[in-house]
Amino acid sequence: MIHKIIRWFGSQVELARQLGVTQSAVAQWVADEKVPPYRAIQIERITDGQFKAVDIIGDDQDEWL
């Protein structure tokens, strides 16, 4: 899912800029294949629901609760 989101934004740098994080933070999400829930919510809002937070978090939901 994170790869689709990055493609939508055009680059890791642009995604990071939109979220107010570093590109290295985004790179870590790619490496871990996990996005923190609060960032997933932010992505859902920024993309007007194009990507749903619940789908971004996926099977890791219980881990974050």
Regions from the language model: what does each represent?
Residues 3-4, 8, 13, 17, ...:
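Short, charged recognition helix plus adjacent turn
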Residues 33:
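The DNA-recognition helices of helix-turn-helix-type DNA-binding domains
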